[in-house]
Amino acid sequence: RALFGRGEGVACILGTGSNSCWCRGGEIVENVPPLGYVLGDEGSGAALGRNLVNGIFKGHIPLREEFLAAHGLTYEEIILRVYREPYANRFLASFAPFVHAYLDCPEVRAMVAETFADFAQRNLSRYPVHLTVACIGGVAAAFEGLLREVLAHGGYRVGLIAASPAEGLIKYHYGK
């Protein structure tokens, strides 16, 4: 409702987690299950963090020292936080600002683009291609330029991208 009101389109949330649905007339027509950060949540902050940590420790992203210094963590502490402590999704998503800060690094930019392309392939491809795609959430807003680029490259029409649904919900419910 915040993105399309009573219209039609594919509404997406890209924040700590991710979700999408085809909506029409303010109602959900279809939803591809997000499956959470272990099995899904493509395009989310948790996915960006997971892919960053993977890329850094497997040597695909050349920012290991910068990352460890910025977060005051060791490899062992990261593994412990992900596998032994609660809210691993939030922990992984907390690395999104680092990702954003290093977006000019070609390997980071490629990783973010791949993360968004994965979201499109695994989620958006399940909906009719003629529908406009709009996104809400901190990740969507922070990476808006690259998100638009990746979705347009995939053949999607991209509408509104915003950090918060508040303005759209006020408009929907109060007509303002």
Predicted regions: what is each one?
Residues 1-66:
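Phosphate-binding/catalytic loop of phosphoryl-transfer enzymes
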Residues 4-10, 53-176:
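ATP-binding/phosphotransfer module of carbohydrate and carboxylate kinases, centering on a glycine-rich
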